[in-house]
Amino acid sequence: MTLSFKPEDKLILALDGMSGAEVFMLIEKLPNLIWVKVGLELFTLLGPQIINQLRDRGKKVFLDLKFHDIPTTMGRACYQAAKTGAELITVHACAGKKGIEEANKSAVKGAKEVGLPPPSLLAVTVLTSWGSKDFVQELGIQQSLDQRVSLLANLASSAGIQGCICSPLEVMKLRKDFPEPFQLITPGIRSCGENINDQNRIMTPLEAIDAGSSKLVIGREVTSSENPSDAFNRICSQLI
């Protein structure tokens, strides 16, 4: 069977819980790694220069800061974020259509000013740490979790951005409503037998791809492994 995609291009490795030195040591062990995720922890620790350092090592960067503020602030933040060269940038869908539109317009402007292609903005729907029961009890939202995800994905699409972040459990329904090239990027990925940690809505890598995920965010299964290269290659092999 000939694959229509490169397994390594479907995986985004979350660089969480590490120092800068540990990040670069890990990357050296993963020559096939294409995508990395820079989240709040690493960005706060090392600042925007970490993105340049990763890109200098040939990596594509998913900047996962989940911007959520008034439209003007979101626009200014995404304008600066786009100048770093990150290929993917997250905003919270709950910021609303106007905020998402301002973020997208400003990101395009920021990238253009430094001669870079515009990043893809992705709207976070409902965090994968939320379960259905907690979602209703703690937030008091009188919608099912699935309904909320669909509402926010529709909002993201109507705002003209390139995709959204959702759990793999919602992907199949969303993919019917939002065909490619709309991106559906999914955390909450665990191979069979792996610890689910603080995730609630999870799938295996192959299940998520088959359901319609564009890319999968993986992390501790690789970063906490005694042999990260073997762990990464094992996940890739599950997609073949």
Curated annotation (Swiss-Prot):
Pathway where this protein functions: Pyrimidine metabolism; UMP biosynthesis via de novo pathway; UMP from orotate: step 2/2
SUPFAM superfamilies, A to Z: Ribulose-phoshate binding barrel (SSF51366)
Keyword annotations: Decarboxylase, Lyase, Pyrimidine biosynthesis
Reactions mediated catalytically: orotidine 5'-phosphate + H(+) = UMP + CO2
Active site (catalytic residues): 66 (proton donor)
Gene Ontology MF: a single term: orotidine-5'-phosphate decarboxylase activity
EC number(s) from the headed UniProt entry: 4.1.1.23
Domain of life, per lineage: Bacteria
Binding site for substrate: 16, 37, 64-73, 128, 190, 199, 219-220
GO cellular component term of the entry, any: cytosol
Keyword Lyase: yes
GO terms (BP aspect): 'de novo' pyrimidine nucleobase biosynthetic process; 'de novo' UMP biosynthetic process
Pfam family name, one: OMPdecase
Signal peptide start-end: none
Function statement: Catalyzes the decarboxylation of orotidine 5'-monophosphate (OMP) to uridine 5'-monophosphate (UMP).
Family (UniProt): Belongs to the OMP decarboxylase family. Type 1 subfamily.
Subunit structure and binding partners: Homodimer.
NCBIfam families registered for this protein in UniProt: PRK00230.1, pyrF
Protein name: Orotidine 5'-phosphate decarboxylase
Species for this entry: Prochlorococcus marinus (strain SARG / CCMP1375 / SS120)
